[in-house]
């Protein structure tokens, strides 16, 4: 069934965490299976949003953006032009898997780039290549409304979530409420709302309230267990130190939000899933736990409508 003309359209461009699946330097069970064709490959995290299915905006710009755009005909330029139907790129933080794609887009800057002042200043002050993007880059304060599309149908607001300074900025910048954000997008025509929160250090009451007020939620699914990466690579930091709430901890609270779509309920999907996370295998016990709780694992190429 085609979306209603007034529906917000959502395309999952990438559902993996940084490095994708398979990750080039990893021999974990999921990466081995993905190389052998046993698991679908996944690209690094990003969403595309549209008010009309014609012009689009991106939530974060992953290093895989060139491939992601190529795989989505709606974001192809019209024949004979370089007019990409892209209005806005919104950044939720300064993690490299969320911003490196901006440098790929530099040759055809979108209508605008939007982030918090902290994210904009950190990138422009400490990473010279991003200065090429300064003319298109606007800063939005927390909870400041920003129209994603030219007609103003989709209103975006960034709100703070628990997080940390990206590793590449360690020692260069201090943590601030604007450092790590999630995105709330409301369709002014219908009142329906999406929340995208790919990096959350812990599921606090404020973040949970934002999710509870949304009709479609994407939440940090980086790791299933806090010690997951440590078991794969001894000496590695745990999930909390990396700024990610493990699924094992967030699932009980998120399960209270998920309701069957058939009854007008709320869909809750995990995204930003690390290659080490066993939920990438649909047959794993961990994936079964997520499904039984009424939640989903986002998939590359998945399309939804609100």
Q: What do these predicted ranges mean?
A:
Residues 19-44, 144-239:
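Active-site-proximal loop/helix segment associated with metal-binding centers of metalloenzymes
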Residues 48-50, 184-186, 303-305:
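Short, well-ordered beta-strand micro-motif
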Residues 58-62, 85-97, 115-116, 195-200, ...:
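Active-site neighborhood of phospho(di)ester-bond hydrolases with catalytic His/Asp-centered motifs
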């Amino acid at each position: 069934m085609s979306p209603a003309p007034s529906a917000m359209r959502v395309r999952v461009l990438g559902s993996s965490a940084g490095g994708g699946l398979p990750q080039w330097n990893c021999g974990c069970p999921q990466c081995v299976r993905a190389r052998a064709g046993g698991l679908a490959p996944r690209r690094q995290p990003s969403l595309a949003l549209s008010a009309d299915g014609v012009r689009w905006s991106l939530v974060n710009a992953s290093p895989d953006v060139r491939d992601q755009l190529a795989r989505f005909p709606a974001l192809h330029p019209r024949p004979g032009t370089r007019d990409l139907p892209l209005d806005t790129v919104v950044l939720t933080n300064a993690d490299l898997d969320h911003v490196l794609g901006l440098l790929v887009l530099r040759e055809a800057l979108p209508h605008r780039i939007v982030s918090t002042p902290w994210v904009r200043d950190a990138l422009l002050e400490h990473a010279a290549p991003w200065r090429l993007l300064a003319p298109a880059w606007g800063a939005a304060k927390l909870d400041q409304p920003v129209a994603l599309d030219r007609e103003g149908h989709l209103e975006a607001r960034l709100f703070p979530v628990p997080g940390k300074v990206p590793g590449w900025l360690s020692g260069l910048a201090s943590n601030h409420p604007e450092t790590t954000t999630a995105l709330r997008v409301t369709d002014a025509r219908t009142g329906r709302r999406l929340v995208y929160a790919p990096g959350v250090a812990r599921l606090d009451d404020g973040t949970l309230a934002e999710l509870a007020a949304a009709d479609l939620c994407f939440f940090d699914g980086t790791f299933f267990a806090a010690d997951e990466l440590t078991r794969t690579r001894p000496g590695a930091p745990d999930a909390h130190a990396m700024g990610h709430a493990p699924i094992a901890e967030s699932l009980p609270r998120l399960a209270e939000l998920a309701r069957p779509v058939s009854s007008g309920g709320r869909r809750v999907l995990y995204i930003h899933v690390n290659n080490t996370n066993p939920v990438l295998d649909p047959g794993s016990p961990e994936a079964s736990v997520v499904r039984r709780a009424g939640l989903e694992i986002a998939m590359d190429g998945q399309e939804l409508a609100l």
